[in-house]
Amino acid sequence: MAENGNKIAASDYVNAMKPTHRLGHALQKMFDQYDVLLSPVLASPPVKIGTIKMNTNDMKTYVERLTKYSPFTGIFNQSGQPSMSVPLFRTKDNLPVGSMFSAAFGDENLLFSLAGQLEQAQPWAKSLNVMREILLETI
């Protein structure tokens, strides 16, 4: 990625960012009507570390692999609106399933407040060691 980035002129970068800025403005309009958007974090249950290989220099292949597994997070990574992943559920193998909550620009406090309420209603912190052990089994 870094090598490809060095080949891009500043003017091309500015032009390439215009759709990203339009996306951010469109999402912001949605948040004028809704406080929080809920979506899954991943398109499928979590997999063990090392299952998905991102070892390619082909940017198109990299993006395809990434968006196939995680199609929901990129829009907010790109637009800059705050989001959080909360492990509210588990698979049958006890792996965490993330619920992604997103909010308007500057509404991080809303997400922190929501996270606190969700943690009280369904605590997940105690299961972190179990999750770590399961995810690291293959390393």
Question: For each of these PLM feature ranges, what is it?
Answer:
Residues 13-18, 25, 33, 67, ...:
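Structural helix-boundary/capping segments
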